[in-house]
Curated annotation (Swiss-Prot):
The gene is BEND6. It is found in: Nucleus. Residues 1-15, 134-148 have a biased composition (Polar residues). Residues 1-65, 134-172 are annotated as: Disordered. This is BEN domain-containing protein 6. Residues 171-271 form the BEN domain. Residues 62-99 form a coiled coil.
Amino acid sequence: MQKIVQTDEITNTQAFRKGKRKRTETMDSENANSDMDKGQRDPYSGNAFLPGESSSEDEEPLAELSKEELCAKIKSLKEKLTNTRKENSRLRQSLVMLQVLPQAVTQFEELVGMAEALLKGGGTMSTSASTLWRATNNSSPDSFASTCSNSNSNSSSPVSLKPEEEHQTDEKQFQIEKWQIARCNKSKPQKFINDLMQVLYTNEYMATHSLTGAKSSTSRDKAVKPAMNQNEVQEIIGVTKQLFPNTDDVSIRRMIGQKLNNCTKKPNLSKNLNSQDIK
């Protein structure tokens, strides 16, 4: 009787183990199917390839490509990189313009108010207006942003300023920025000064100003041009000597004067052509 009971217990134990093993296998199978379904429903999760990427099964391995095919692939990638950089640059310029636009509108409104005040009561142009006038023709959005930010600090100043106050304000305001230096050709001092002055001033300003304000013996113009702000001249000299230590002040001044003379000759040439047409 005892043997029969032991035999029944062994049989029950084996049956229980078989049932437990079967349930475990069933659960593992269900989990595997669930993971497979999840991978099909969400192809971009886990180790799935991102959009725009292709798996090694879809794309032929580089080792199997010929030399011509590799060159064509490299050329295509270079073109994509160039286009991406151009688009990135365009978007950055657009972003700068969007950031500057509200401030630019405010500055122009102030200029209109200043012009109306000058027409009604007379007086001298404020530093803010003169600074904007000199940088109006600069096409760089960064240049206009810098001009607006510099002139914004003086937006609350009165329309009419004394010459001494205006001169002191210009001296405090003028500073050559790093981005302005970065835009210039640094191969030779004359090329650097030409590019730097083109960034800092408009052609109209350079054509109507001289280095010292004194009349040159070789100049054909009867009128004496006003001198540039000497603080600005010293700033240009200092920046130039940092890049070209062997260049002295006299040479740099001569180069600045040469740039001013070149801008002066252009309007005269067009005036002579117009006079010939009239004759």
